[in-house]
Amino acid sequence: MAQGNNYGQTSNGVAEESPNMLVYRKMEDVIARMQDEKNGIPIRTVKSFLSKIPSVFSGSDIVQWLIKNLTIEDPVEALHLGTLMAAHGYFFPISDHVLTLKDDGTFYRFQTPYFWPSNCWEPENTDYAVYLCKRTMQNKARLELADYEAESLARLQRAFARKWEFIFMQAEAQAKVDKKRDKIERKILDSQERAFWDVHRPVPGCVNTTEVDIKKSSRMRNPHKTRKSVYGLQNDIRSHSPTHTPTPETKPPTEDELHRQIKYWQIQLDRHRLKMSKVADSLLSYTEQYVEYDPFLVPPDPSNPWLSDDTTFWELEASKEPSQQRVKRWGFGMDEALKDPVGREQFLKFLESEFSSENLRFWLAVEDLKKRPIREVPSRVQEIWQEFLAPGAPSAINLDSKSYDKTTQNVKEPGRYTFEDAQEHIYKLMKSDSYPRFIRSSAYQELLQAKRKGRNIPIFPCHKNCTPTLRASTNLL
């Protein structure tokens, strides 16, 4: 019967390349010794109530044989090895779909070599559907479908609805062939076929041992390929593995290679590393800081006028007076202040009051340059250069010599990022000096501490910039 089932198989060439083949060969050597007539596991026929169970042996027989013949001292190790072999389907319990080994009187049976995984079986879902359909045709308690098999059969019947008649006919033909076999032979072959499918379509929760590890497959295809880091250092971790095959000796590193290695390790020592606890604390602090600005978590203040009857938001926008919550956000960092148009305006006013606004004006001019059309970029680069960096510039900024020299070279070939280094230097200066003074200034503190006062703004007449929609909504109020 086993030979009559046409399950899909791969070619011999692919079989030899499979990373699992080494494991299969070792297991099959042990199985061959187990089946030896003189020194193997004794196989017997057990008499049960009104029936016989042919060609079986117990789980304790396997464990004892492994301990005796493979010089294994620990019974737990022998049980683990036997479980791995059972999971690959070389022997199986006759009354359980879970392929595991138990050190007791549970009966097991050897799998026929035709169904061994070394034959590289790749059975299709249609084959599985034929097998399950055939099981339903045989009115025997031992062939009843398990719950997960019944679910699989229903799913396959839906998937192959158009060709189900052909599947049913194939199952019916196989069932007729099975009926012509001897009773004992049929019982053995039925259990072996069931074990085959327990390997390739395992019980939910069990591991499919036929899957190929992509890392092992890659190593098998490139056995002599060495891994190198991006810095040119050879990764010799595999050389310490007990299963690694030594590669031919390589040339000793040259002086330049040693210098590169020293430089690489020095860079690694200087790298800034953070503990996961510090990263988690930083993330929690950021979340707590910005939680009140997330409308999904905290109701916005003022509320959305399109969702409520409160027009405070429109009134604040019309008055151009920033809310207390908005001003508070400027203190989180200089990026928050520069990102807000009102924040930029207040920051610029503060710097103008101290006669030091040239840094911020330069930074804003460079940001504007990045958004200009390409045809306007060369002329705008010259304007920025003449205003902030040229000798005798009216709003000269203070740059270090390195940034100034690089910017001078970049101006010869003007582009949107000509002043990138100068802008970064000015940004750091403002962040360390101008921005802290702005946050500590009385102007910012007054905006921050100002209490929101109730406003009695007359609804009529509407200002001339009021949209018709807004005018209509205020009339309704």
UniProtKB/Swiss-Prot annotation:
Keywords, sorted A to Z: Cell membrane, Cytoplasm, GTPase activation, Lipoprotein, Membrane, Palmitate, Phosphoprotein, Signal transduction inhibitor, Ubl conjugation
Broad class of where this protein is predominantly found:
cytoplasm
Q: Which residues carry this modification: Phosphoserine?
A: 229, 241, 434
Summarize the PTM comment.
Answer: Palmitoylated.
Which SMART domains does UniProt cross-reference here?
DEP (SM00049), G_gamma (SM01224), GGL (SM00224), RGS (SM00315)
Q: Name one GO cellular component term.
A: protein-containing complex
User: Under what name is this protein listed?
Assistant: Regulator of G-protein signaling 7
Q: Which gene encodes it?
A: Rgs7
